[in-house]
Amino acid sequence: MPSVDVEIVNKDENGIGELKVKGPNVMMGYYQNEKATKEVIKDGWFYTGDLAYRDKEGYIFIAGRKKNMIVLKNGKKIFPEEMEDLVNQIDLVEESFVFGMPKGDDLLLSVEIKYNEKVAKEKYPNLNEEEIKKLIWNKVKETNKLLPKYKYIKNMILTKEDFIKTSTQKIKRFEEIKKFI
């Protein structure tokens, strides 16, 4: 973008770091919220909270949000948005929410799935709810094979209920997590 400077800072071993931007069209701060402004504007740079990387051609890709990142005990980082994009491609999945469920001193990578009852009845009319759950779980395990082992989803919760959302229809991640911990 013309007249906008972009940098990726605090990169990990995969080159993923926080995206920061500076320019005349970048926000100057939060309206009447100096504390929040100081958290994101530093030395004239706006720290977006987006975790990004640059490819060989110089294009920038967003991997996920800093506040949503799941960090395992071994230091491996998981971006739930990446996982949700894959899970949401399963025909029976209406929407999914990936999170780290506490297990001992680590996290168990889990997914809550709202399944599409209409699709289930149309495509699999002879399956009961338990069989639908098993079918979806098998499809999640197939999806796992596309990923490094540390990103494997190891637990699934199936629901018919809508997720708790903001007015802009984003999942309230921390509210959803409270249901399980």
Kindly label every feature range from the protein language model:
Residues 9, 15, 61, 78, ...:
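Generic structural signal for well-ordered beta-strand positions
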